[in-house]
Amino acid sequence: CAVSTGAVGIDIEAIKYIDLNVGKRFFSESEYAYINNAPPNLKLNYFYDLWTLKEAYINKIGKGLNMRLKDFSICFDKNKIYVESAKYPENCYFYKYDIIKNFKMSLCTSIYQTKCPIIFIRQEHLINDFIDLINTKEHNLSSLTEL
C-alpha cells in the first residue's frame, strides 16, 4: 500500500527465476536490450527492476493492465529514472527499493519526495487497526443518531 497527497502507484515482486525471453512480450526494445546487456549475474535483478517500475507507473496513472507494457519505456539516466510515453506524458518520480532479500519494490509518484519512508506493518496489526477504525466510526455514527 502507498499513501501520498498526489497520484501514486506501487508494485512489489518476489525475485524468482524467470525465462528472460518473456521480456520480448512485455518490454520495449530498449528495455529488453538493457536486460540483455546486463552482466549475467544481474540480468534477473534488472528484469525485476524494470517490471516493478512499469507496474508502479501504470498503477499511478490508473491504467492497470489495461495498458500494454510495451507502449512505454522506463529509462535510466545516471541517477534519474523516467518514462518515455507519447500517450501519457505526465510528471513522474520513481523510487526503487530492495526491501527484503529477494524482493523488489518500486514506487511512482506525481510529487517529488526527497525521502519516501517505508513502514512495515504486520498483517494482524493492520487488520486490528482496521477493525478499531470501523468500530470507532460505527460508534461515532450511532452517537449521531441518538441526538
What are these regions (language model features)?
Residues 1-147:
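Core catalytic alpha/beta fold that binds nucleotide/phospho-ligands
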